[in-house]
Amino acid sequence: MFLMGPTASGKTALAIEMAQKHNCEIISVDSALIYKQMDIGTAKPNAAELALAPHKLIDILDPSESYSAADFRRDALIEIEAIIKRGKTPLLVGGTMMYFKALLEGLSPLPSADETIRQQIQTRADIEGWEALHQSLCEIDPVAGARIHPNDPQRLSRALEVYYISGKTMTELTQTKSAALPYEVVQFAIAPLDRKVLHELIAKRFTIMLEQGFVEEVNSLMARGDLHLDLPSMRCVGYRQCWQYLEGEFDYDTMVEKATAATRQLAKRQLTWLRGWPDVHWLESGAESNLVTLQRQRG
């Protein structure tokens, strides 16, 4: 079973209840929860919640490390098989839609990241600008060039990196995919009916995070000395804005405003993915009937 939804929509609480009452085991599908030492800003389930319903694929990486959709697919397939062998139902819960898509449909055989080539691309961008690199991509791979915006350095860099490593364009390589998920899946999405309600939930949750010590959490991460804002972990919503606040780029109130706005944008992107997602059953956040609906559709 998939339980998808935007941030702050109530996925975790519903998943824990489902796991307790209906013989499920939870696998996290979240690119932020994979990181250790990042508990408050990721809204990671607390010790009491994890005691009620353990989650697979959380706290598996140091914040200095990277983790791809391919890494997730590999690890999730191992966990799914183990859960099924135990006679239980895998319940995959989260909002990282790229992970869900990779698991469901399979992935193209793209080469692993090469830090040396990536740094060469960054150095060239620092000198020539990303606009010039985008022009290079358009010449190498017009299809990818049309799809990737010049102001999207992460995807632009990856497209060039793939070509420099393999000698083939990303468009060529993405025409072949690994096998789709070899299991029947029932898919659910949970969200408030009113976007205003979701925005209120996001603001309330960030306030609670601050009360729980989020700024202190980010300060501890900064104090390690080996982390920086270009790492995937530090690009997680809230962490980047709090880091910038601690470096003196803006004041506390601006940090709160920017972090909340970034979280709203994340939720908007997640909902955009979900509205185009096939074969999904929608649930309303907080509805008392959700557990019954999950169990009925599960069959």
Swiss-Prot record:
<keyword id="KW-0460">Magnesium</keyword>
<feature type="site" description="Interaction with substrate tRNA">
    <location>
        <position position="118"/>
    </location>
</feature>
<feature type="region of interest" description="Interaction with substrate tRNA">
    <location>
        <begin position="30"/>
        <end position="33"/>
    </location>
</feature>
<feature type="binding site">
    <location>
        <begin position="7"/>
        <end position="12"/>
    </location>
    <ligand>
        <name>substrate</name>
    </ligand>
</feature>
<feature type="site" description="Interaction with substrate tRNA">
    <location>
        <position position="96"/>
    </location>
</feature>
<comment type="subunit">
    <text>Monomer.</text>
</comment>
<feature type="binding site">
    <location>
        <begin position="5"/>
        <end position="12"/>
    </location>
    <ligand>
        <name>ATP</name>
    </ligand>
</feature>
<dbReference type="GO" id="GO:0005524">
    <property type="term" value="F:ATP binding"/>
</dbReference>
<feature type="region of interest" description="Interaction with substrate tRNA">
    <location>
        <begin position="154"/>
        <end position="158"/>
    </location>
</feature>
<keyword id="KW-0547">Nucleotide-binding</keyword>
<comment type="function">
    <text>Catalyzes the transfer of a dimethylallyl group onto the adenine at position 37 in tRNAs that read codons beginning with uridine, leading to the formation of N6-(dimethylallyl)adenosine (i(6)A).</text>
</comment>
<comment type="similarity">
    <text>Belongs to the IPP transferase family.</text>
</comment>
<dbReference type="GO" id="GO:0006400">
    <property type="term" value="P:tRNA modification"/>
</dbReference>
<dbReference type="InterPro" id="IPR039657">
    <property type="entry name" value="Dimethylallyltransferase"/>
</dbReference>
<dbReference type="InterPro" id="IPR018022">
    <property type="entry name" value="IPT"/>
</dbReference>
<dbReference type="InterPro" id="IPR027417">
    <property type="entry name" value="P-loop_NTPase"/>
</dbReference>
<dbReference type="GO" id="GO:0052381">
    <property type="term" value="F:tRNA dimethylallyltransferase activity"/>
</dbReference>
<keyword id="KW-0819">tRNA processing</keyword>
<keyword id="KW-0808">Transferase</keyword>
<keyword id="KW-0067">ATP-binding</keyword>
<feature type="region of interest" description="Interaction with substrate tRNA">
    <location>
        <begin position="235"/>
        <end position="240"/>
    </location>
</feature>
<dbReference type="Pfam" id="PF01715">
    <property type="entry name" value="IPPT"/>
</dbReference>
<protein>
    <recommendedName>
        <fullName>tRNA dimethylallyltransferase</fullName>
        <ecNumber>2.5.1.75</ecNumber>
    </recommendedName>
</protein>
